[in-house]
């Protein structure tokens, strides 16, 4: 973790340019006691935005059809000293938020030493989470999770949050025309208030952020609002399940390691699992939402200790793409780090490295393209003996590359038919590896 990022290539290149010779303005004030007609205040919903022109605005009508039990409200409020504030309330929704939208802002002068600061009061966040976002060019935004510090701030009144603006910058981002320089998004259920939002040329950050260059290879628990309650208990339950299997002389000969797609073998894929893998006393170590660093944390905290499977099937990385927008090289580095960890902890086990599955309907999907860029680099991680790479993605797609909802209803997770396709496509290589002599 870091309080400020240093030596980012994009910052260095900018500071060496002529545009950096002029001192940045002292601050870009986005919200305070002064009316700012050039700043639009927006309430965010999953598929819509709603401008706050009066005292409050809700997204309830837009939510009614798809999310009938959900609610989002953004209202003007006051701080104890009478200063202007905004209060966001949301209930049972995966995305809500307050955003400040402006004419294009050139934030490049602020990247090297600038900060984003705002006052925050958390009234309720037991069942929710927060995320701070800053735009970084057309169709680009970067985020800093604020789940744990947000919950820690609950009931403690107003607090000043100061983040290094470099927390939101990656190589290649374009901060020359940012139209949404601030958003605070909520998930689950909660209530928070904000005030005095500004981007300053200086300041001392008081809130840490992960380094985008190393986050995928740095072991971490999955501390999302929707995972905190179950993720660590599931890890402990899986440790106990593995120990019990070993005690009963049914040590797993096959282990699957991955994210929700792997965890789905316990749900939609359960009938297929029983047909193909129960005979190997197979163990499912899939955890919904996991990114490469979360799998790495589990491996380093006992996930496969004491086991000696013939084969471990590893597929991970689609959440690096979908939840955080990692560069392909970062995700590949995380996969490589997990392979090294598995090799160290399971020295007699062969690893079947499976290409990340296709997602979204068409080949033009940006997220699918990122996954394909990752997959293109994975064969280099395999030696054909200890680590074998397998790409079964063609089995899921029509000839023109379309992914059908008949096998992945949400265009990401297989249903039972999708798991049957996976098992059939993987079976020849898996059977071959299971039949080989031990390393």
Features from the language model and the residues they span:
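Oxyanion-hole/transition-state-stabilizing segment in secreted/luminal serine hydrolases
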Residues: 263-278, 292-336, 341, 352, ...
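Catalytic His-Asp segment of secreted/periplasmic serine-dependent ester chemistry enzymes
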Residues: 358-439
């Amino acid at each position: 973790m870091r309080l400020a990022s240093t030596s980012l290539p994009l910052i260095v290149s900018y500071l060496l340019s002529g545009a950096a010779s002029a001192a940045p303005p002292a601050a870009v004030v986005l919200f305070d006691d002064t009316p700012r007609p050039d700043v639009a205040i927006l309430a965010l919903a999953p598929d819509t935005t709603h401008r706050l022109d009066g005292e409050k605005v809700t997204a309830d009508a837009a939510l009614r059809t798809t999310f009938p039990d959900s609610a989002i409200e953004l209202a003007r409020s006051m701080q104890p000293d009478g200063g202007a504030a905004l209060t966001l309330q949301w209930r049972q929704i995966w995305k809500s938020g307050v955003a400040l939208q402006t004419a294009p802002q050139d934030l490049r002068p602020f990247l090297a030493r600038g900060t984003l600061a705002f006052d925050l009061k958390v009234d309720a966040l037991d069942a929710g989470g927060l995320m701070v976002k800053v735009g970084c060019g057309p169709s680009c935004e970067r985020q800093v999770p604020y789940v744990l510090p947000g919950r820690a701030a609950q009931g403690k009144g107003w607090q000043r949050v100061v983040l290094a603006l470099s927390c939101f910058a990656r190589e290649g981002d374009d901060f020359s025309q940012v139209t949404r320089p601030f958003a605070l998004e909520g998930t689950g259920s909660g209530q928070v208030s904000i005030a005095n939002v500004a981007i300053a040329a200086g300041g001392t950050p008081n809130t840490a952020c992960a380094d985008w260059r190393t986050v995928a290879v740095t072991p971490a628990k999955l501390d999302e609002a929707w995972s905190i309650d179950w993720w660590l208990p599931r890890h402990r339950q899986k440790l106990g399940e593995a120990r019990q299997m070993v005690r009963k002389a049914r040590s797993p000969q096959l282990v699957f390691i991955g994210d929700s797609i792997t965890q789905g073998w316990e749900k939609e894929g359960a009938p297929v699992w029983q047909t193909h893998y129960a005979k190997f006393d197979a163990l499912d170590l899939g955890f919904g939402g996991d990114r490469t660093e979360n799998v790495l944390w589990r491996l380093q905290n006992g996930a496969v200790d004491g086991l000696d499977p013939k084969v471990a099937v590893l597929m991970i990385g689609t959440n690096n793409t979908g939840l955080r927008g990692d560069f392909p090289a970062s995700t590949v580095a995380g996969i490589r780090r997990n392979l090294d960890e598995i090799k160290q902890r399971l020295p007699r086990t062969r690893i079947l490295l499976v290409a990340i599955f296709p997602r979204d309907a068409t080949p033009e999907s940006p997220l699918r393209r990122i996954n394909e860029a990752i997959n293109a680099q994975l064969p280099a991680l395999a030696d054909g003996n200890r680590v074998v790479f397998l790409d079964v993605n063609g089995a899921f797609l029509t000839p023109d590359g379309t992914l059908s909802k008949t096998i992945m209803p949400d265009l990401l997770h297989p249903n039972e038919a999708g798991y049957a396709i996976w098992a059939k496509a993987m079976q020849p290589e898996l059977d071959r590896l299971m039949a080989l002599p031990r390393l």
